[in-house]
A protein has these predicted regions:
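Stable alpha-helical elements in mature extracytoplasmic
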Residues: 18, 25, 40-43, 76-80
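Generic structural signal for residues in well-ordered beta-strands
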Residues: 36-38
Length: 136
């Protein structure tokens, strides 16, 4: 497991204690070198409200970087790293809405739903950051 320091990407992951797919996503992120701080909540509505995450962008867990960027849902760790290299102006993070099959933590054999990773902006508008088929 990576150690926290100034050079490592650190995410605080807000999740419910009983969500197995969130635990699988955390394992994926840790294996990619991301330091994870887990925060369990019985209800995530207060977290989603605090960070002003539009319901159309929501998923089962919310990750926050030490710089305040939001990563909502089952986003591939490499995509998070790519975004953080050059965040879009006025963006607040990325979202994979829902829980698409084949996204990290949602693996089901070889099945892979086509899904998009969205950039979400301060005004809660969004645009496509990339398609799942473009994730290497």
């Amino acid at each position: 497991m990576p150690l926290a320091n100034e050079d490592n990407l650190t995410l605080t992951v807000h999740k419910t204690p009983f969500c197995g797919c969130c635990k699988k996503w955390i394992k994926h992120a840790r294996e990619a070198g991301i330091y994870i701080i887990e925060k369990d909540h019985q209800n995530l509505n207060a977290i989603k409200s605090e960070y002003k995450i539009n319901p159309k962008h929501q998923s089962c867990h919310t990750s926050i970087s030490k710089d305040g960027y939001i990563f909502e849902g089952h986003i591939h760790a490499d995509v998070i790293k790519k975004y953080l290299e050059n965040p879009s102006e006025n963006s607040k993070g990325l979202s994979v809405p829902g829980m698409p099959i084949g996204s990290p933590g949602m693996e089901m054999g070889g099945r892979l739903d086509d899904y998009v990773v969205l950039t979400i902006f301060e005004d809660n508008k969004d645009e496509i950051f990339l398609h799942s088929r473009d994730i290497q």
